Amino acid sequence: MLPSLIQPCSWILLLLLVNSSLLWKNVASFPMCAMRNGRCFMSFEDTFELAGSLSHNISIEVSELFTEFEKHYSNVSGLRDKSPMRCNTSFLPTPENKEQARLTHYSALLKSGAMILDAWESPLDDLVSELSTIKNVPDIIISKATDIKKKINAVRNGVNALMSTMLQNGDEEKKNPAWFLQSDNEDARIHSLYGMISCLDNDFKKVDIYLNVLKCYMLKIDNC
């Protein structure tokens, strides 16, 4: 049965605090939480509406980061090789597109989003760390990657909080795959970072789909 109670949502405050200086579009249009006994309360419906909007903004920013990285390092031999790329999340049993997501039970869809977000917890740290070691990398790329990492971590905390609140087995053991970037060859590291950002782009498009399908489910929106 789908929960409909008003729940304390301190993680929503975390999302807003993390991004308050980053000018999220349309955040002001979302309903704010009600304060009771010093605690913030928000309905699940409002929570998913906000999460859906934030995830969509992050997805756009990750795509922009990928485009900027690809453009800046376009002269690196073989960078745009279209051969299949195996991502650190390839083994995860998650819906591949919106059609599959719509056919997935809300609890399984929420778990799928959590699995992808958890799988990127450590690789995001590696991504930001490795970018700073590449010669002539533009400051804007490092800045965007750092920004994205903070926002994704905030969404991950939020989704995991929803998992704990809505699902009885929300605290099940997590299996987070590693991503190895070690190499003395600069071009090889650029290739690896390119592949990593490409995978992040694809994965966060999935997260965006999942959270917005869940939003439609919670708000009972037919044409979404």
UniProtKB/Swiss-Prot annotation:
One GO cellular component term noted in the UniProt record for this chain: endoplasmic reticulum
Gene Ontology MF terms in the entry: growth factor activity; hormone activity
Glycosylation sites: N19, N57, N75, N88
Family note: Belongs to the somatotropin/prolactin family.
Post-translational modification: N-glycosylated and sialylated.
Protein name listed in UniProt: Prolactin-2C2
Tissues expressed in: Expressed in brain and cerebellum. Expressed in placenta and hair follicles, with highest expression levels detected in the outer root sheath and no expression detected in bulb. Also expressed in body fluids such as plasma and amniotic fluid. Expressed in embryonic fibroblasts and at low levels in keratinocytes. Isoform 1: Expressed in brain and Neuro-2a cells. Isoform 2: Expressed in brain.
Disulfide-linked positions: C33-C40, C87-C199, C216-C224
Localization per Swiss-Prot or TrEMBL: Secreted; Endoplasmic reticulum
Main localisation: secreted
